Amino acid sequence: MMKIKIHRGLDQIGGCITEIWTESSRVFIDFGQNLPGNGKPTTPEEDALMVADIVENNEKEHQAVFYTHAHEDHVGLFPYILFDQFISEGGKELLLIKYKTLLEGNEIAREKCGRQRVPDRSEEERLEECCRRTKTLIDKLETFRTWKRTGRGDYPKPIMVGNIRITPFFCCHSIYDAHMFLIEGEGQRFWHTGDYRGHGYMSKGQFLMLRKYATNIDVLITEGTMLSREDKAISEYRVSMEMIDVMRAFKYVFVLASATDIERLGSINHATKKTKKPLCIMSLFVKRTMELFTKREGNLGRGLFSFSPLFYTDRLYSKLRDKGFTMVVGPSHGDKVKALLNRLPQEETILIYSSWNGYYMREEQVRANAKYKEFREMFHNVVDIHTSGHVDRDAIKKVIGMMHPKEVICIHKEADARL
């Protein structure tokens, strides 16, 4: 019989680690870093020891890690894994874009530091160490094995780890190319959902897929992020419609959103086109993720995921001052945004905050990273337009009702949340 151990995730959101094994083989689903305010904060040294303790405690002849998606709370401990690691093609590309862009920024900063009239040697050494660590992470990511997402209606190709068979199924989440897993071995069938939702553009067909393939399930391992919240998630399409109303009312629109969430960027793209504004960006990271999404998904949804943004520089200011704009930004762009805000009339300018409101409302989140709250406070006009990247309570009930699993294990949830 296959056995399951939830090392982390039963009483916290994020930082999930699930182990499934037989006599000869085992797989881990996700090895995630703890989120601020969820689980005990740890140092890199503590993370390395914790991973080693888990890995060495139940070693098998055949073993591997499978990542549901590329969010840090699911993939963040990858540097400490010494055997095969698998992730979707899109997930691997996103992670490489992230770390290569970070490396490029650190290298530029290091060169500037070295060219100063009186070089800051301690800062130069710090940046050198950052570059070295980031290169090591990139080298590690390059070794990741991947699977190719299948077309709608096609059965994905299973991956064998000893006598355990893992089949990845594409799902909708707030990051590109997320997957669920069917895990089979010794006559049993387990289904691990990872993070998912039923209200995005890419969730079409998701329940049909579950009805067709998630049959005779012995154990369902499902996320439960929204279990303690009674509100029903609005659709991604509704997000876009609400953005259109705001973009018609204001000439200069900044949208704070994740650069890795293809569907949210698609909502912004659609609203921007409908209101005939130029789509603008300030970040090389956003530029590169949009290029990835356009290359891989640009022919879907009548161009919903085909992006042609303008990269903002001062040379564009006069043109954009006349035409207005939609500017996709992140919390780390505060200085650039503030400089532009000082040149714009505040009564015609607004921030659409399109991220989780806990980043600026919850004390533990603000203590961990105050940039979201500080970013909002730069604007006179702010509106929240957002929907969750996670499945709501009603949709979880629907999934359980469709599968009729013999057992349900709920992870990625608050400690007091119950099905």
Stretches found by the model and what they are:
Residues 35, 227-228, 262, 332-337, ...:
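Short acidic, S/G/P-rich loop/turn micro-motifs used as interaction or catalytic elements
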Residues 359, 382-419:
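Internal alpha/beta domain cores that form substrate/cofactor-binding pockets in large enzymes
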